[in-house]
Amino acid sequence: MPECWDGEHDIETPYGLLHVVIRGSPKGNRPAILTYHDVGLNHKLCFNTFFNFEDMQEITKHFVVCHVDAPGQQVGASQFPQGYQFPSMEQLAAMLPSVVQHFGFKYVIGIGVGAGAYVLAKFALIFPDLVEGLVLMNIDPNGKGWIDWAATKLSGLTSTLPDTVLSHLFSQEELVNNTELVQSYRQQISNVVNQANLQLFWNMYNSRRDLDINRPGTVPNAKTLRCPVMLVVGDNAPAEEGVVECNSKLDPTTTTFLKMADSGGLPQVTQPGKLTEAFKYFLQGMGYIAHLKDRRLSGGAVPSASMTRLARSRTASLTSASSVDGSRPQPCAHSDSSEGMGQVNHTMEVSC
């Protein structure tokens, strides 16, 4: 991939164009970091605070970053024509190999939030060889039933679309207090994202099916994510229950569950420092950036105890041979057979 590809691109896929923003250039055979935002947002609203954080920029110097905007959600997007059929959540996932192939990425580390986390999880289930690892924030692995559907419809009749989306993004406490962050996002969701296009994405997300994953050993031929996963959710966030359930369905030997206090519904916005630290240890556990210098350590600071535990957990549960110099780590062993039924394993859970 030439360095001149840094910037914005519209990529042809089987289900329409995808707006993609590339930052940086490939570093050897290292994976790309690929992001996917939540419904109501775009890559800027969802990830700018996180990726502009100083310590996060120290990390991303070692990778090319690929930000994906869901169809019609980018800044300045044209409104879809009447009768346009928005891609299903499965089709959104099936659009991503076109992006990977277009830029010549061998595999990616995905960072997704909410609807974007669901899309990336589905992508990893369908195309496991393309995904090296996943950071899934606020993921809900469950489909919407009739009661949920009716509640969503009723909410749409009594609330504006931005307010309906805000109740998905933020905790009840944040909404009641009407924090500056909530006010800012209400304004930006109303003015930056095309409302008709957003309604289509919102409707499709609320029509999603179950991810259909089960923890290995709980049922014969269990299907689950085969790559290392870090689950992230804020205390009392709307997605907390869904993330807890997702954690129960993943392989505990390759999963870390990070519950962040005082972070509300958007931990990547409210606690970018803590999330960056966790992401750094997640990457180091996979064998990447082992020698990355922490800017704060030179001033005498030390990593928090919870982050140290996370680092030990990742290092103990994930084995990688020579990825520090750019080659791919050995994939985690995974079996879809019924061997090991009844084994009791515990995911590494960290609160910070």
Curated annotation (Swiss-Prot):
GO terms for cellular component: basolateral plasma membrane; cell projection membrane; cytoplasm; cytosol. Predominantly expressed in the brain (at protein level). Detected in neurons of various parts of brain, including the olfactory bulb, olfactory tuberculum, cerebral cortex, striatum, hippocampus, dentate gyrus, thalamus, hypothalamus, mesencephalon, cerebellum, pons and medulla oblongata. SUPFAM superfamilies: alpha/beta-Hydrolases. Belongs to the NDRG family. Residues 301-352 are annotated as: Disordered. It is found in: Cytoplasm, Cytosol. The modification Phosphoserine is found at residues 298, 317, 323. The gene is Ndrg4. Residues 338-352 have a biased composition (Polar residues). Residues 308-323 have a biased composition (Low complexity). Pfam families: Ndr (PF03096). Disruption phenotype: Mutant mice have impaired spatial learning and memory but normal motor function. This is Protein NDRG4. GO terms for biological process: cell migration involved in heart development; negative regulation of platelet-derived growth factor receptor signaling pathway; negative regulation of smooth muscle cell migration; negative regulation of smooth muscle cell proliferation; positive regulation of ERK1 and ERK2 cascade; regulation of endocytic recycling; vesicle docking; visual learning. InterPro entries: AB_hydrolase_fold, NDRG. Contributes to the maintenance of intracerebral BDNF levels within the normal range, which is necessary for the preservation of spatial learning and the resistance to neuronal cell death caused by ischemic stress. May enhance growth factor-induced ERK1 and ERK2 phosphorylation. May attenuate NGF-promoted ELK1 phosphorylation in a microtubule-dependent manner. Keywords: Cytoplasm, Phosphoprotein.
